[in-house]
């Protein structure tokens, strides 16, 4: 089944060209099926690029998915036009009465700030609490994952001496996990962050389980056993050129930055990088969507009633 998004969303044509099945509102009405309701709380500056990355993974599922784009109400985006936001986004205040089968919270380029200094931290806390009653399963990514695991479990973040930046080998620590179905024993994942969470802090909670880890970059994916929450601290959703874009952005701005590790062929920035993580990104999101489908109530309004 395809993903349902507005046919004027910039990601629509790109997804069609990539072979992802998408549908319009008219097409969706003709299908006698309840689509999975997935919300995307997009905290990234380049919202259009992030929309495409997430829609690409969610839309690859054989299930019909309706993707709702959501933004923080009290924060003005600097890198996305107001016209785009008004056309395609709702604020959390506008959707907080709804129920969602799945909810994605993205990263944000604010990881060096203490959580309490983030201008929208209060609203972020309200959203995280709201997911407990209005969302069946949540996928938290990068800063979104750090914020969520801090909010729910008090797991702190630690500033790194230098940016963790590149493509790193990771280990599958729980091959029997429903979220790692089909995963290799080891695989590569893009990393781009200035902070980290640590295994010792996570292991203090009996309800958290580490599923992916790197000997160089530490914890990558954590599963909350009872809360149906995933914490992904790296960027499986990244495009082939995402790290390259970040690298050249900083180089052009005169910001000190090391070349991303294990990324450019022969460490030559003039050569196009190869995507070596795409298949596992699709596996992770496909497994997540499938688990939602298997466990969410048929009546979306019953979500949260089992708590």
From Swiss-Prot:
The active site is at residues 142, 235, 237. One of its GO terms (cellular component) is cytoplasm. Pfam families: HTS. The record marks 111 as: Important for acyl-CoA specificity. It catalyses: L-homoserine + acetyl-CoA = O-acetyl-L-homoserine + CoA. Substrate binds at residues 163, 192, 249. GO terms for molecular function: homoserine O-acetyltransferase activity; homoserine O-succinyltransferase activity. InterPro entries: Class_I_gatase-like, HST_MetA, MetA_family. Its main location: cytoplasm. It is found in: Cytoplasm. The record marks 192 as: Important for substrate specificity. Keywords: Acyltransferase, Amino-acid biosynthesis, Cytoplasm, Methionine biosynthesis, Transferase. It comes from the Bacteria. Its EC number is 2.3.1.31. Transmembrane segments: none annotated. GO terms for biological process: L-methionine biosynthetic process from homoserine via O-succinyl-L-homoserine and cystathionine. Pathway: Amino-acid biosynthesis; L-methionine biosynthesis via de novo pathway; O-acetyl-L-homoserine from L-homoserine: step 1/1. PANTHER family: HOMOSERINE O-SUCCINYLTRANSFERASE (PTHR20919:SF0). Belongs to the MetA family. Transfers an acetyl group from acetyl-CoA to L-homoserine, forming acetyl-L-homoserine. NCBIfam families: metA. This is Homoserine O-acetyltransferase. The lineage of its organism: Bacteria, Pseudomonadati, Pseudomonadota, Alphaproteobacteria, Hyphomicrobiales.
